[in-house]
């Protein structure tokens, strides 16, 4: 059984900055000077992370906001988090 304390909390990295654009957002990793683009749903997940929303709650919000299947929303959030984590744009911290 997975305990809540075993699941990391994802937070925006200190050296990541985001600017909203029409239909998405652009994220700058200030350490590497690399830019990344997010589509509309990716930008929504980023916004939710900035608000301190958990990955599970972010997926639930995507279901509400975009009327998508819960398993699809969960998979999309986890995939985005994995990519952001790999690029150093978010950090996984213990709860």
Residues covered by each model-derived region:
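Long, low-complexity, charged/polar intrinsically disordered regions in eukaryotic proteins
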Residues: 1-25
């Amino acid at each position: 059984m997975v305990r809540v304390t075993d699941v990391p909390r994802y937070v925006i990295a200190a050296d990541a900055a985001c600017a909203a654009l029409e239909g998405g957002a652009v994220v700058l990793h200030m350490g590497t000077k690399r830019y990344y683009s997010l589509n509309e749903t990716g930008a929504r997940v980023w916004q939710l992370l900035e608000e301190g929303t958990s990955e599970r709650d972010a997926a639930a919000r995507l279901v509400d906001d975009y009327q998508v299947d819960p398993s699809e929303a969960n998979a999309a959030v986890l995939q985005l988090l994995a990519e952001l984590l790999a690029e150093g744009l978010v950090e996984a911290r213990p709860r």
